[in-house]
Amino acid sequence: GLFDIVKKIAGHIAGSI
């Protein structure tokens, strides 16, 4: 769902830090 997309984006940002 939409929250899965949010989590995926958040995970990408977390991996970029």
Curated annotation (Swiss-Prot):
Expressed by the skin dorsal glands. Keywords: Amidation, Amphibian defense peptide, Antibiotic, Antimicrobial, Secreted. The modification Isoleucine amide is found at residue 17. Pfam families: Antimicrobial20. The keyword Secreted applies. GO terms for biological process: defense response to bacterium. One of its GO terms (cellular component) is extracellular region. It is found in: Secreted. Has antimicrobial activity against L.lactis, L.innocua, M.luteus, S.aureus, S.epidermidis and S.uberis. Probably acts by disturbing membrane functions with its amphipathic structure. Shows anticancer activity. Belongs to the frog skin active peptide (FSAP) family. Aurein subfamily. This is Aurein-3.1. It comes from Ranoidea raniformis.
